[in-house]
Amino acid sequence: KIYFISPVWWFRLTPRTEIFFDEVFTPGFAYKFKSITKTYSYPISFLKGKKLRTYITHGAPALPVLTLYVNSVKLRLVMGVYSFVFGWKLSLFTKTKQFWSVPFVSDKKREKYLKVVEKDIRRDINLIKI
């Protein structure tokens, strides 16, 4: 199981997270391109069997990001990075969770966010067969 936790800066994950993707999820290690024609190919994932969870924290409220900006942070991450590296699967969307207005929410709301993460991790631990 792979977990990513990152804040969003300027509608992207942090530069350190982006650099990690650039330097680790490289062609030849994470995926390769399969040619269809001379000018077109598609990615074949080498990490298809890996399980992934992502938690993204936003300073912004949900409404403008999900509507005006068409949820571009999550869409870019899942479609632009994860589908290359982990192959296409619906769980890449459902297991990428976003927490909104993090610097401005109450402690109670922040605790609720943390409980979501804890619940997911406990669920993952219980699925591990020893």
What are these regions (language model features)?
Residues K1-L75:
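Helix-loop-strand module that forms the ligand-binding subsite of alpha/beta enzymes
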Residues P64-I130:
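Glycine-rich phosphate/pyrophosphate-binding loop and the adjoining helix
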